[in-house]
Amino acid sequence: MKTTIAEVNQYVGQEVTIGAWLANKRSSGKIAFLQLRDGTGFIQGVVEKANVSEEVFQRAKTLTQETSLYVTGTVRVDERSPFGYELSVTNIQVINEAVDYPITPKEHGVEFLMDHRHLWLRSRRQHAIMKIRNELIRATYEFFNERGFVKVDAPILTGSAPEGTTELFHTKYFDEDAYLSQSGQLYMEAAAMALGKVFSFGPTFRAEKSKTRRHLIEFWMIEPEMAFYEFEDNLRLQEEYVSYLVQSVLSRCQLELGRLGRDVTKLELVKPPFPRLTYDEAIKLLHDKGFTDIEWGDDFGAPHETAIAESFDKPVFITHYPTSLKPFYMQPDPNRPDVVLCADLIAPEGYGEIIGGSERIHDYELLKQRLEEHHLPLEAYEWYLDLRKYGSVPHSGFGLGLERTVAWICGVEHVRETIPFPRLLNRLYP
């Protein structure tokens, strides 16, 4: 019976065949222990000299790391194993022998591992991170589908910059200038006027010359946009969504969290409501903590976000930023036009901003004024202005950065481990 490691619990006491790679091995006299992986999980294969032919036993002792195999054996319960089962091996068939696999069980430097990212993905740690990333994506689709959202795909090539910045990757679109997308938000606003509640999930590109542990050049964003949602509606949805993601990982990825050594007691606290600070209150909190390098009107850096997060055991909203700090499309607070109806959600434990969101301007004249204040060409945004001319309504949305969210939930220090093939300031390979 051919099966996978994830399904061996269905075949206890039965003989099965698994296609796998040899992650590691050790031998002791008349017994060999094979650490096998097949993508669905890890299992130990036990080869006892008394139970196999001499040829099979010698083959087991000489197998090299990452050799691909068909391994046949009887499934046994093993309470000592994190997985709960082991394979009592009866036969081994080599598919392809791996010679001089570069990533040995010893410690390796980060640059070496990044040069071999295509192989580093095979490790237990990276396997766990990718499985948790996948669970966040699965849970995202489940969350929004259950709430009546429609998945809409935004273009990667655009003729304008949603944030109105210069941090763009430029390319030629035949005879026109084009840019790699920084966000699908503007297109989601158009889609929300047609479909009510929508979300996009795709790659975004920022030509930021940042080398911090929080920054990637290419990263993935989940961007919902909702017609008839005002500021408070938006915050409640964000709380619900982030809590849903965390609880899904806690319930479905226990093995992976354990493999990463993640303290799940901190994640168990992530349930609505989340604490809130206005920008004004956040500035005061930082001053009270002794920060002298920030005043009203300044944006927060990583040390500031970390200091704010340390005051709470859940993600915290920072709301009502100065209008001057935020993009042109954010709705000013009607009671105080110098701030906008926006919020950044700061993750605990120093992982920084994972969500940025706001209520959007829905008045044509105000949006046009804001575009002019930001010195953006009106002709490039004519279609976006049209949304305010033809049945505009209050609407809101947000963007969640997948990689920072993965880093926080997994408890990994750097976002380079949270995406299969990271694109960094100094890295475009492999």
UniProtKB/Swiss-Prot annotation:
What's the protein called, per UniProt? Answer: Asparagine--tRNA ligase
Keyword NADP listed = no
Q: Identify a single GO molecular function assigned to this protein.
A: ATP binding
The first-level EC class reads ligase
Q: What is its main location?
A: cytoplasm
Entry EC no(s):
6.1.1.22
At the top level, the lineage of the source is Bacteria
What is a single Pfam family found in this protein's UniProt entry? tRNA_anti-codon
Name its cellular compartments: Cytoplasm
Alphabetized, the UniProt keywords read: Aminoacyl-tRNA synthetase, ATP-binding, Cytoplasm, Ligase, Nucleotide-binding, Protein biosynthesis
Q: Does the keyword Coiled coil apply?
A: no
Per its UniProt record, what HAMAP family does this chain match?
Asn_tRNA_synth
The entry's family comment says: Belongs to the class-II aminoacyl-tRNA synthetase family.
NCBIfam families in UniProt: asnS, PRK03932.1, PRK05159.1
Q: Which gene encodes it?
A: asnS
Family annotation (Gene3D superfamilies): Bira Bifunctional Protein, Domain 2 (3.30.930.10), Nucleic acid-binding proteins (2.40.50.140)
Q: Which PROSITE patterns match?
A: AA_TRNA_LIGASE_II (PS50862)
GO cellular component terms, alphabetically, are: cytoplasm
Task: State how it assembles.
Answer: Homodimer.
Which CDD domains does this UniProt record tie to the protein? AsnRS_cyto_like_N, AsxRS_core
* Gene Ontology BP term (one): asparaginyl-tRNA aminoacylation
Q: Which reaction does it catalyse?
A: tRNA(Asn) + L-asparagine + ATP = L-asparaginyl-tRNA(Asn) + AMP + diphosphate + H(+)
